[in-house]
């Protein structure tokens, strides 16, 4: 299996990040990659480092045009992808990695799991 890792500098503009994602999918497919993996929260700057900022403009659902666009690009380019989006489900927001197959179908989901507040355990 040939895996492409998308190295992106994210902008505050979702559309710019989306277009860059589509471009990277095409490039990975042209180079015969089977799967392309994207960075955390790929359509926005990495905002978790700024806990007080308003990030509502970056929230989406799996039905958003951006997720559908990535799915279409996978189908058109015959490549699997693992994009990462800031998703809202049932009133909760978190980043979620999807696994999209080469037919554009979502075949896997992984929600972010944060272990904040857990005490460090002793290792021997």
Regions from the PLM with identified roles:
Residues 6-12, 51-58:
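Short, basic, glycine/proline-bearing loop/turn elements
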Residues 9, 42, 86-87:
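Catalytic metal-binding/acid-base residues of hydrolase active sites
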Residues 60-62, 88-124:
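Active-site catalytic loop in hydrolytic enzyme cores
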Residues 27, 69-77, 98-102:
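Alpha-helical structural signal in soluble globular domains
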Residues 3, 17, 25-54, 74, ...:
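Active-site beta-strand/loop signature of hydrolases that rely on acidic residues for catalysis
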Residues 55-68:
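A short acidic, glycine-rich active-site loop
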Residues 71, 80-87:
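Short, basic/aromatic recognition patches
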Residues 1-12, 96, 109:
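Active-site-proximal beta-strand elements of phosphoester/diester hydrolases
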């Amino acid at each position: 299996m040939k895996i492409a890792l998308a190295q992106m500098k994210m902008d505050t503009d979702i559309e710019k990040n989306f277009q860059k994602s589509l471009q990277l999918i095409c490039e990975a497919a042209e180079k015969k990659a089977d799967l392309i993996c994207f960075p955390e929260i790929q359509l926005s700057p990495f905002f978790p480092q700024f806990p007080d900022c308003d990030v509502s403009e970056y929230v989406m659902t799996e039905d958003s045009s951006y997720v559908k666009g990535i799915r279409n690009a996978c189908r058109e380019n015959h490549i699997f992808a693992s994009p990462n989006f800031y998703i809202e489900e049932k009133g909760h927001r978190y980043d979620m990695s999807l696994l999209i197959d080469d037919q554009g179908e979502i075949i896997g989901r992984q929600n972010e799991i944060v272990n904040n507040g857990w005490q460090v355990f002793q290792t021997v």
